[in-house]
Amino acid sequence: MAAKQVLFADEARVRIVRGVNVLANAVKTTLGPKGRNVVLERSFGAPTVTKDGVSVAKEIELKDKFENIGAQLVKDVASKTSDNAGDGTTTATVLAQAVVQEGLKYVAAGFNPIDLKRGIDKAVAAAVEELKKLSKPVTTSKEIAQVGSISANSDASIGQIIADAMDKVGKEGVITVEDGKSLENELDVVEGMQFDRGYLSPYFINSPEKQVAALDDPYVLIYDKKVSNIRDLLPVLEQVAKSSRPLLIIAEDVEGEALATLVVNNIRGILKTTAVKAPGFGDRRKAMLEDIAILTGGTVISEETGMSLEKATLQDLGQAKRIEVAKENTTIIDGAGDGKSIEARVKQIRAQIEEATSDYDREKLQERVAKLAGGVAVIRVGAATEVEMKEKKARVEDALHATRAAVEEGVVPGGGVALLRAKQAITGLKGDTADQNAGIKLILRAVEEPLRTIVTNAGDEASVVVNTVLNGKGNYGYNAATGEYGDLVEQGVLDPTKVTRTALQNAASVASLLLTAEAAVVELMENKPAAAPAMPGGMGGMGGMDF
């Protein structure tokens, strides 16, 4: 076991906070409509230019191990916020830095860190309740467009295309983002279906950037039992291999020898396959497999109907234009099913909805109708260069997450105003001890920080703007894009409630844990001798292998 270095109390905290500041200062430059870009070096290919907080955070790894602890903790704030709300990563980072910096002053002054944490938790709970009161539901397409625009760094065209996509496939519909072929953003609605089952092995992934297995013009084998013996599959695999087309296998499960053989064939490029578990359970699984069969023009291979896997032919398989299999879901785009059969199936399910007695059954049946009839909206992002396209695509994906969050929990005034208005719920709050009161006071100062950062990035005086906004009421705030004060909701400056709430909760959670740390342990760096020069020409017998 390697030797460790241990630092205690202030000595540890100061080093850790230095790391917090390095990461937060890099991320916070991107906040607001006048936030700047950050350029990220890549080992291969062109650098990436981004305004996405979590993308910047993920790239930062510090040499000093104690500083790196701080950086990694704040990175965790950004990642968790991105996972839960899909946006608000920069706001979360700014809040975490503010809580840590303010908290450190109190700890240095002799306040008890545990009581400080309790005060912080009380203040955050009160602020979250106030945010819920401020929240208003998103009802119109215009509001959806406004939320999307703000999240995409005030790009109105991105907000509009997301609103159009939601109009076409519904707020619960499936929307995917792809690379475009022109300079303009385009929206296509493709007949398709998505279900919540992903690939059975990561070795099926053939698009590492998106972490998906993408199959173009595939066959679809639908089977209602487990597949564990590869011999059962061989006849149909041979037929598919002759056609030189990929294959998606949807079964109750694919395991053991069968899965291993499919993976090996896939890696070697002999037959491009992906296997997923069938969606749903029990009778619902049977019904969903039937839906997929009708959508793709195939047949469910089931012993109940007298069919067996060994005797399956290409005529029994479904087909689609494209299928994308991610870790947790599968999207079938443009299935080859007959339009009239799909219509009849939708009619049949709608009749079942009328007869359904439980809300749960009704909801599940409505989901099936949406999947069969709704389709998939594809936003194709256009740009002049690949670097610009990557940056723009990341913004579109962020905006899409933000609009979904807005539909889920509603919106609050943007531009850091909602957090300032939440101060009124914290102001009258009292803790059990003086130290808890200090924790509450700390949050009162920290919630100003997002607005201060937005204003600083816009080149204005932060303290003046914060005081002016605090003297106003309701939606009154500062629009950094125009440099004017006014009703931010009317001006379309909106933030999803879920994003603001998640950012505050995650920031306070990680930052207060950091304040209560009294020791830090890291591995000592070993002074290793310089590595020997590489052998010329590569190692024998390794020709043709990629590393």
UniProtKB/Swiss-Prot annotation:
It is found in: Cytoplasm. The keyword Methyltransferase does not apply. It is an enzyme of class 5 (isomerase). Its EC number is 5.6.1.7. One of its GO terms (biological process) is protein refolding. ATP binds at residues 30-33, 51, 87-91, 415, 479-481, 495. One of its GO terms (molecular function) is unfolded protein binding. InterPro entries: Chaperonin_Cpn60_CS, Cpn60/GroEL, Cpn60/GroEL/TCP-1, GroEL-like_apical_dom_sf, GROEL-like_equatorial_sf, TCP-1-like_intermed_sf. Gene3D superfamilies: GroEL, GroEL-like equatorial domain, TCP-1-like chaperonin intermediate domain. Keywords: ATP-binding, Chaperone, Cytoplasm, Isomerase, Nucleotide-binding. One of its GO terms (cellular component) is cytoplasm. Pfam families: Cpn60_TCP1 (PF00118). PROSITE patterns: CHAPERONINS_CPN60. Belongs to the chaperonin (HSP60) family. PANTHER family: 60 KDA HEAT SHOCK PROTEIN, MITOCHONDRIAL (PTHR45633). Forms a cylinder of 14 subunits composed of two heptameric rings stacked back-to-back. Interacts with the co-chaperonin GroES. This is Chaperonin GroEL. The lineage of its organism: Bacteria, Pseudomonadati, Pseudomonadota, Betaproteobacteria, Burkholderiales.
